[in-house]
Amino acid sequence: MELEGRSAGGVAGGPAAGPGRSPGESALLDGWLQRGVGRGAGGGEAGAYQPPVRLDPESGPEYEALPAGATVTTHMVAGAVAGILEHCVMYPIDCVKTRMQSLQPDPAARYRNVLEALWRIMRTEGLWRPMRGLNVTATGAGPAHALYFACYEKLKKTLSDVIHPGGNSHIANGAAGCVATLLHDAAMNPAEVVKQRMQMYNSPYHRVTDCVRAVWQNEGAGAFYRSYTTQLTMNVPFQAIHFMTYEFLQEHFNPQRRYNPSSHVLCGACAGAVAAAATTPLDVCKTLLNTQESLALNSNITGHITGMASAFRTVYQVGGVTAYFRGVQARVIYQIPSTAIAWSVYEFFKYLITKRQEEWRAGK
């Protein structure tokens, strides 16, 4: 429908009301018009007549560009919900990935593919065995993803304004993703250590507190961050590839950057698959550092494995070049729906929260 431009006295023809539109919707559209005209399409002063503005009442304005809607709190809440849901839904596959990355697995824990692994784990170890350690993962994922998305959105906008004013910069997207990863991994690394030790075959830990206590007493507090540098070495390129691929695909499938669930799912899934396959060798080394796999240690290594270089040498000594790609199938299968869930849930909650904030402001 066509809505006349606003003058100093109001919208010509009355408020942005129409048949079938509630007072709240009318107030919301009225607020959008007021902000748009106040700025002036051609840089004119507020109060000058503006040409007719066409708005699609179904989609509204570009939700990512609302001037005061998407606050840091919005990104943090949306990111926390997305992170928790992502990890909870995909946790059984993550358990399989950890086991398939084992360098010298027990004969009872040698799996041909993801489905066989899940079936055998549930049949021989119990229906809920693939979910062991989920509670500590969810506890870490909430704050980690809140920091992650809030930092990413803030830096993406700041760097894009510097590198490519008025446009979108792939370099800014990649750099923002890298910096956001520093905060995410700092919050998530201890939970990763505990989670992966509980996921291993014949793990002696049945409760999170048992695992935390044993690691603290036997290896010290530093064990919770032993894999931090390797995690960063893996996640920084992973997130750079991930964010750059996602934003690149969004430019093609959703150039107007409106809330579009199908584009968020598709772009997130593709970005996750590409990034996961490219960084699998680093993920194998991270798993070794987190678990300190006893069979690998007993074979030809003494003491604890510390640092990325040591992990790379150990992986090669035990399994050769092919060992760097153990679990690549499970990792890609995990990341495709995982990143699709994360982006779609994050964008949905960002859209929902922003819309509610705008409705509240318009009704004041």
From Swiss-Prot:
Low complexity bias: start-end ranges: 18-27
Q: Does the keyword Iron apply?
A: yes
Principal subcellular localisation of the protein: mitochondrion
Q: Where are the transmembrane segments?
A: 72-91, 133-152, 170-189, 227-246, 261-280, 327-346
Tell me the compartments it is located in. Answer: Mitochondrion inner membrane
Mention one GO molecular function. Answer: ferrous iron transmembrane transporter activity
Recorded hits in PROSITE patterns, A to Z, give: SOLCAR (PS50920)
Name of a matching Pfam family: Mito_carr
What segments bear the compositional bias annotation Gly residues?
A: 7-17
Q: Report how it sits in the membrane.
A: Multi-pass membrane protein
Region spans: Disordered = 1-28
The record's Solcar repeats, renumbered to this chain, cover 70-158, 168-252, 263-352
| Alphabetical UniProt keywords | Ion transport, Iron, Iron transport, Membrane, Mitochondrion, Mitochondrion inner membrane, Repeat, Transmembrane, Transmembrane helix, Transport
The record's catalysed reaction(s) read: Fe(2+)(in) = Fe(2+)(out)
GO cellular component annotations, sorted alphabetically?
mitochondrial inner membrane; mitochondrion
Coiled-coil residues: none
Task: Please indicate which superkingdom the organism of origin belongs to.
Answer: Eukaryota
Tissue expression, as annotated, is:
Ubiquitously expressed at low level. Expression does not vary during erythroid maturation.
Q: Which Gene3D superfamilies match?
A: Mitochondrial carrier domain
The record's annotation in PANTHER family points to:
MITOFERRIN-1-RELATED, MITOFERRIN-2
What this chain does, per the entry, is described as: Mitochondrial iron transporter that mediates iron uptake. Probably required for heme synthesis of hemoproteins and Fe-S cluster assembly in non-erythroid cells.
Spell out the family assignment given in the record's similarity comment: Belongs to the mitochondrial carrier (TC 2.A.29) family.
Name the record gives this protein: Mitoferrin-2
Source organism of this protein record: Mus musculus
